[in-house]
C-alpha cells in the first residue's frame, strides 16, 4: 500500500479557544493554515478533504461536514463523520494545527496498515497524538456507539480497538499551534 492510494482528512472544526481565533484561518506564507496543509498533503495522498462543522471556506475545499445526528462539538463526532464517508479503507486524519507533520512521519506509520491494526497513531515520549494517524473506516459504527453514550474522547477507542502507537522521539515534529505565541514562533521560522 502506498500513500498516494489513500485519502487524507484535515480536521478544521476545533473551537480554537486557547488560540483566541479560528486556527484554520491563520496565515502562513500568504495562505491560511488549511490551504498550507491541503497543499502539502495533496502532493502525498490520493485526495485531501477538510472536516468542519460547516463550510467556512466558501466551497474552496472538498468538505466533510460533521453529522447532524449529534448536537455536540467533539473530535469523536468529527471522526465518526469522516469515517462514515469511506468504505473499507484507511484514512489519514490530522488536525489542521499540526503543520510540521510530513511525509517522513507518514512513511514510518504506513507499514502498520498491512498488519492487523484498525488504528495507527503517532506517539512521542510525552504524548499520544490521536489526531495524527490512520483510522479504518469500519470504525464509524464504534464511534457512533461512543457518541450515543455521550463519550467524546477519541482515546476511548484505543482500549477497545487494536491500536498501534508508532514511536517517534521528536516532539517538535508533532507541534500543535494551540497558542498565538506558538503560531508566531512557527511563522517566523518559515521565513
UniProtKB/Swiss-Prot annotation:
Q: Which UniProt keywords apply?
A: Cytoplasm, GTP-binding, Magnesium, Metal-binding, Molybdenum cofactor biosynthesis, Nucleotide-binding, Transferase
Binding positions for Mg(2+)? 97
Q: Which reaction does it catalyse?
A: Mo-molybdopterin + GTP + H(+) = Mo-molybdopterin guanine dinucleotide + diphosphate
Enzyme Commission code? 2.7.7.77
Extract the CDD domains matched here: MobA (cd02503)
Chain residues that bind GTP = 11-13, 23, 66, 97
The EC class name is transferase
Which GO molecular function annotations are given, in alphabetical order? GTP binding; metal ion binding; molybdenum cofactor guanylyltransferase activity
Might you name a Gene Ontology BP term for this protein? bis(molybdopterin guanine dinucleotide)molybdenum biosynthetic process
Q: Cite the Pfam families for this sequence.
A: NTP_transf_3
Q: Which InterPro entries match?
A: MobA-like_NTP_Trfase, Molybde_CF_guanTrfase, Nucleotide-diphossugar_trans
Query: Which GO terms of the cellular component aspect does the record hold?
Result: cytoplasm
UniProt subcellular location: Cytoplasm
Q: How does it assemble?
A: Monomer.
* Entry remark concerning the domains of this protein: The N-terminal domain determines nucleotide recognition and specific binding, while the C-terminal domain determines the specific binding to the target protein.
List, alphabetically, the HAMAP family matched. MobA
Function of the protein: Transfers a GMP moiety from GTP to Mo-molybdopterin (Mo-MPT) cofactor (Moco or molybdenum cofactor) to form Mo-molybdopterin guanine dinucleotide (Mo-MGD) cofactor.
Q: Which family does it belong to?
A: Belongs to the MobA family.
Name this protein carries in UniProt: Molybdenum cofactor guanylyltransferase
Q: Which organism is it from?
A: Campylobacter jejuni subsp. jejuni serotype O:2 (strain ATCC 700819 / NCTC 11168)
Cite the source lineage: Bacteria, Pseudomonadati, Campylobacterota, Epsilonproteobacteria, Campylobacterales
Amino acid at each position: 500500500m502506498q500513500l498516494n492510494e489513500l485519502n487524507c482528512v484535515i480536521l478544521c472544526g476545533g473551537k480554537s479557544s486557547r488560540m483566541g481565533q479560528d486556527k484554520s484561518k491563520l496565515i502562513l506564507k500568504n495562505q491560511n493554515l488549511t490551504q498550507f496543509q491541503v497543499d502539502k498533503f495533496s502532493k502525498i495522498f490520493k485526495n485531501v478533504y477538510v472536516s468542519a462543522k460547516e463550510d467556512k471556506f466558501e466551497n474552496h475545499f472538498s468538505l466533510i461536514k460533521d453529522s447532524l445526528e449529534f448536537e455536540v462539538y467533539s473530535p469523536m463526532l468529527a471522526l465518526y463523520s469522516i469515517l462514515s464517508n469511506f468504505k473499507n479503507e484507511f484514512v489519514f486524519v490530522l488536525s489542521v494545527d499540526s503543520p510540521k507533520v510530513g511525509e517522513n512521519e507518514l512513511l514510518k506509520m504506513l507499514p502498520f496498515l498491512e498488519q492487523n491494526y484498525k488504528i495507527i497513531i503517532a506517539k512521542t515520549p510525552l504524548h499520544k497524538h490521536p489526531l495524527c494517524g490512520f483510522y479504518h473506516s469500519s470504525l464509524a459504527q464504534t464511534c457512533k456507539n461512543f457518541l450515543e453514550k455521550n463519550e467524546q474522547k477519541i482515546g476511548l477507542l484505543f482500549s477497545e480497538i487494536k491500536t498501534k502507537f508508532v514511536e517517534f522521539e521528536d516532539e517538535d515534529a508533532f507541534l500543535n499551534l494551540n497558542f498565538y505565541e506558538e503560531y508566531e514562533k512557527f511563522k517566523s521560522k518559515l521565513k
